[in-house]
Amino acid sequence: MLCIGITGGIGAGKSLLSSTFSQCGGIVVDGDVLAREVVQPGTKGLSSLVDAFGQDILLPGGALDRRALAVKAFRDDAARNVLNGIVHPLVANRRAEIIAAISEDAVVVEDIPLLVESGMAHLFPLVVVVHADVELRVRRLVEQRGVAETDARARIAAQASDEERRAVADVWLDNSSTPEVLVQRARDLWYHRILPFAYNLSQRQAVYAPAGLVTSDPIWLGQAKRIVARLKTTCGHKALRVDHIGSTAVPHYPGFPDFQAKDIIDIQITVESLAMADELADPLLSAGYPRLEHVTGDAAKTNARSTVDRYEHSSDPNLWHKRFHASADPGRPTYVHIRVAGWPNQQFGLLFVDWLKANPGVRADYLDVKRTADRLAAGDMGRYADAKEPWLLDAYRRAWEWADSTGWRL
């Protein structure tokens, strides 16, 4: 089952996005509907709201007066936090009940207005944010919903900022044009990314790195930050650390030539043992990262290095074993390397990035090697890796010489 999260500020067009995905075949779990359900007359939720905000948030018949509640709950951060503290846990429990009853082959669309504010974004393999600027949203609320302008602005101000939403957005859909334009963008997203993602996940099938080198893209760092947060949430205490590694972790440095890389995000999860790595297989699959069992380790080095004494200068090839997962999302190819803390391959994954960042000459040399390898490989990733290996073997020695000279440690 693929569960995606969608969100957007009030008046941005989230309801239209949700209904479009529903028409495409998605099973929509609407956070607004659940939020209303858990505060119906006679519920614990409504009783708690009355205790917190007073009897005057009720209509004469005993139902919740949502406008009266909004006036009180959105007046400041403290009041909003009280509201969220009551409603969010109740909605989460009801959501879990609904999800548990849905077929495993479904694509579940979770429509969550406060996805960012509730800290739930990292629970989803894909987050879609629909956006419109503030003035357009105010106009829609006033003209289409009859909300007073001052209330509209207060509600918008009480929600997450555009920057906070953009930070969690795997997909950013602009809705400043007509409804028809948003519908078409949503349908394109559904059929070209979401459905292929769901299929790949059902088949435990990964997306591999596209052929060719591309110039370093500033968005890689933001994408990796989201992936790291998602994987930390998925792995919990079983991950000792989660890091962005590889060439996409090397930013552009002004005044130096552009670096290049395959358009693939490499992530390293550090664990205490391979047994712990195996325990992460199912959680990572649910997060969108199936395991590729044919990849069992990295190219071993003799007299390997480590800052951990018992692994220092070891020639044991078993210390280069790992587990390997990759993303099923065609929109963001990602490799996930799970390595054991202190083992030579885990340490070199981190050292190599720091060495590249600190040495412009090394970056230039490595780029030349990658360009040659890319040309010789003609799109074959195995040949590409093999062509780089002689340089990387020497780079292993040079990187550790740099580590020794600079006092590099984890």
UniProtKB/Swiss-Prot annotation:
Gene Ontology CC terms: cytoplasm
Protein name: Dephospho-CoA kinase
Any one GO MF annotation of this record: ATP binding
Function field: Catalyzes the phosphorylation of the 3'-hydroxyl group of dephosphocoenzyme A to form coenzyme A.
Broadest EC class assigned to this enzyme: transferase
Keywords tagged on the record: ATP-binding, Coenzyme A biosynthesis, Cytoplasm, Kinase, Nucleotide-binding, Transferase
Family in the record: In the N-terminal section; belongs to the CoaE family.
Keyword set includes Transferase: yes
Residues covered by the DPCK domain: 3-201
Lineage of source species: Bacteria, Bacillati, Actinomycetota, Actinomycetes, Mycobacteriales
Species in which this protein is naturally found: Mycobacterium leprae (strain TN)
Annotated ATP binding sites: G11, A12, G13, K14, S15, L16
Pfam families reported for this sequence: CoaE, GrpB
NCBIfam families hit by this protein: dephospho-CoA kinase, PRK03333.1
GO biological-process terms attached to the record: coenzyme A biosynthetic process
InterPro entries per record: Depp_CoAkinase, GrpB/CoaE, NT_sf, P-loop_NTPase
Catalytic reaction equation(s): 3'-dephospho-CoA + ATP = ADP + CoA + H(+)
PROSITE patterns: DPCK
Subcellular location: Cytoplasm
Primary location recorded for the protein, binned into one broad class: cytoplasm
Stretches the record annotates as UPF0157: 196-410
UniProt-listed Enzyme Commission number(s): 2.7.1.24
Recorded metabolic or biological pathway in which this protein acts: Cofactor biosynthesis; coenzyme A biosynthesis; CoA from (R)-pantothenate: step 5/5
Record comment regarding domains: The C-terminal UPF0157 domain is involved in the proper folding of the full length enzyme.
